[in-house]
């Protein structure tokens, strides 16, 4: 249901990295037992977001596999088969309690200040009592018999030993009165029949492990190894939610984030390789990922750092890989009608140094192409600069452009450009600096003046002579 939350994406990433690092298989299963809320649109969106992140799966609903089908809604026959096995073994029983009776039990438990466990009679009902209700057509659920004493322990790969007292659980439902299996029963049957060896999931599923462990044992299945990762927190240390801003992978994709940056950042939410390095490709992560380096404590989602990291990844990309993204955006917004002269490549090389998101390129290009040069030159702030032999500086810039010196500086990237600007300023006895993101030129003695940028630099400067 819904969209792929960044928390779900991180969980998928950890499963992917673990499987790839161990030579295992990464399985995608669609858990759509909530028929009222589950939609095909949501499924397609989740699969699309996982693909965008580069998390390719080995088995799944779209590609099949040896243990399909991979949608829970298509596995009902299997669930009913195993529910019947539990019924025949006496591990479950039919419960004919009405919703009103169950509500009274909750009220009583609350008054007695005890866990709201099932206290109905059907766990010990006679065959005759059960048959009587069946003949009357009374709706019933399947309840699992939980031992009333003892405890259950598991060794979580992240949290270590975790235990529960069985008397806090009570008999729980595995099949609803409408014949639909509940989540805990489905995933147990699925993990067992699909031969899942490891389950890495969010810590909010930890309480479910108790029910699932009991079902595994009753069915005679070996239990997979579990690893429960901490929740992703907002800056205020509460659970990350929509009120904190964007939370889905799709939203970040639309905002102009790169998939490799998202993967890099999500991997660092609760994991590290033990060094100070913060930049990893997905291949690096596969090589270095180990479950024992995943932290127990919650990880804070820092949108500012994610944006910074995205900018670092963007600047490391060859411009050729950005051209299509830029051209597609500029054509869709009407900024660019056609490009046959290498304009997009030049623009990508120039702009990527000063932006953090793909979407920032729109405003950056508009700013670059529509800079109000003449208004700036005629302003009071520019007066002292213009009167201080500006035409000589302009002539020097035009000469540098005509000789190819300026083009060579641009070809050397942002660092090369900054070096050339400083050298030019020294030659003309001006204090010079570069505007980050605008690739512009400031000549001071006192106030800053943007003179131009990009390969069209000569045209506006010609008017200064």
What are these regions (language model features)?
Residues 35, 221-376, 448-465:
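Catalytic adenosine-cofactor/nucleotide-binding cores of aminoacyl-tRNA synthetases and other
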Residues 85, 93-94, 98-228, 233-240, ...:
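Active-site cores that bind ATP or allylic diphosphates and position pyrophosphate for catalysis
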Residues 1, 28-32, 194-199, 247, ...:
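Glycine- and acidic
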Residues 324, 395, 401, 408-465:
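Charged substrate- and nucleic-acid-binding regions of tRNA-handling and nucleotidyl-transfer enzymes
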Residues 369-403:
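Internal anion-binding site segments
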Residues 20, 51, 87-88, 217, ...:
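Short polybasic/polar patches that bind polyanions
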Residues 1-112, 207-221, 261:
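N-terminal Rossmann-like or analogous alpha/beta NTP/dinucleotide-binding catalytic cores
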Residues 9, 40, 202-209, 243-246, ...:
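Short, conserved loop/turn and helix-capping segments at secondary-structure boundaries
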């Amino acid at each position: 249901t819904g969209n792929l939350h960044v928390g779900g994406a991180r969980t998928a990433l950890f499963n992917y990295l673990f499987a790839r690092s161990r030579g295992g298989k990464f399985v995608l299963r669609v858990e759509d037992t909530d028929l009222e809320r589950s939609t095909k649109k949501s499924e397609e969106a989740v699969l699309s977001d996982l693909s965008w992140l580069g998390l390719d799966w080995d088995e799944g609903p779209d590609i099949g596999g040896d243990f399909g089908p991979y949608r829970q809604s298509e596995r009902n026959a299997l669930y009913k088969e195993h529910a019947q096995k539990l019924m025949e073994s006496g591990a479950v029983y039919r419960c004919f309690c009405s919703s009103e009776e169950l509500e009274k039990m909750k009220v009583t438990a609350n008054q007695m200040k005890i866990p709201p466990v099932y206290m109905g009679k059907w766990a010990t009902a006679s065959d005759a009592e059960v048959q009587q209700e069946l003949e009357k057509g009374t709706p019933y659920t399947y309840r699992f018999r939980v031992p009333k004493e003892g405890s259950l322990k598991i060794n979580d790969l992240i949290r270590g030993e975790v235990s529960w007292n069985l008397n806090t659980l009570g008999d729980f439902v595995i099949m609803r009165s409408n014949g639909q299996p509940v989540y805990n029963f489905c995933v147990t049957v699925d993990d067992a029949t699909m031969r899942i060896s490891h389950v890495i999931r969010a810590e909010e599923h930890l309480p479910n492990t108790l029910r699932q462990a009991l079902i595994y044992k009753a069915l005679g299945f070996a239990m997979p190894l579990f690893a429960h990762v901490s929740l992703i927190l907002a800056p205020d240390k509460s659970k990350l939610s929509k009120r904190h801003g964007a939370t889905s992978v799709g939203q970040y994709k639309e905002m102009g984030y790169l998939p490799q940056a998202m993967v890099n950042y999500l991997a660092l939410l609760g994991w590290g390789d033990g060094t100070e390095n913060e930049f990893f490709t997905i291949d690096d992560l596969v090589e270095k990922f180990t479950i024992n380096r995943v932290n127990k404590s919650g990880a804070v989602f820092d949108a500012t750092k994610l944006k910074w990291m995205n900018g670092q990844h963007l600047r490391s990309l060859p411009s050729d890989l950005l051209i299509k993204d830029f051209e597609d955006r500029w054509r869709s917004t009407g900024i660019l009608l056609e490009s046959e002269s290498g304009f997009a490549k030049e623009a990508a090389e120039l702009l990527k140094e000063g932006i953090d998101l793909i979407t920032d390129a729109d405003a950056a290009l508009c700013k670059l192409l529509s800079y109000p040069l003449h208004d700036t030159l005629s302003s009071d702030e520019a007066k002292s600069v213009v009167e201080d032999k500006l035409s000589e500086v302009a002539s020097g810039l035009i000469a540098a452009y005509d000789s190819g010196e300026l083009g060579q500086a641009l070809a050397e990237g942002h660092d090369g450009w900054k070096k050339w600007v400083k050298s030019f300023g020294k030659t003309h006895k001006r204090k010079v600096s570069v505007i980050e993101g605008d690739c512009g030129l400031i000549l001071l003695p006192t106030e800053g003046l943007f003179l131009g940028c990009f390969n069209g630099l000569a045209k506006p400067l010609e008017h200064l002579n």
